[in-house]
Design a protein with these regions (language model features):
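A general structural signal for well-ordered alpha-helical segments in protein cores
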Residues: 15, 24-27, 59, 66, ...
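Acidic, divalent-metal-coordinating active-site segment for phosphoryl/phosphodiester hydrolysis
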Residues: 35-41
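Terminal low-complexity tails and localization/encapsulation signals of metabolic enzymes
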Residues: 116-129
Length: 129
């Protein structure tokens, strides 16, 4: 967190997010010393999902993950994003948002397709409806 070296603090919610992600003590240390969080440490704290040896390896894995996500129900993916983001918004009741999302998705064509495909042991063909 080098911002203090420039006479600044981490902006755009950085002080808040880092404190929630790695704890108050660690966040204070890194933000006040200006030390950088090393890749291995970031991995250990859950700040990153994976470490890569090369840009090419990272891009290939990103493509693999995206291709897997693209096979899932678009409405459900959208609601996962909204609910996880809601968990970090103090103005949002994340549990209520999740309940509303679940109820909404249970009425979708994608839910019917997903459950039918599961019972029929086939790959679902989601429509985003």
């Amino acid at each position: 967190q080098p911002e203090v070296n420039l006479g600044l603090i981490p902006g755009y919610g950085g002080t808040q997010r880092l404190s929630h992600l790695i704890g108050k003590g660690r966040a204070m240390e890194y933000m006040m010393t200006g030390d950088m969080i090393q890749a291995e440490q970031a991995m250990g704290w859950g700040l990153v999902n994976q470490l890569y040896e090369s840009k090419e390896e990272m891009l290939a894995d990103a493509q693999r993950i995206l291709q897997k996500i693209f096979t899932k129900a678009p409405l459900a993916i959208g609601q996962v994003i909204a609910c996880v983001n809601g968990a970090f918004d103090p103005k949002t009741d994340g549990y209520q948002l999740e309940a509303n999302s679940f109820s909404h998705l249970c009425k979708s064509a994608d839910f019917r397709e997903g459950t039918s495909a599961f019972l029929e042991k086939r790959q679902a063909q989601f429509s985003g409806k």
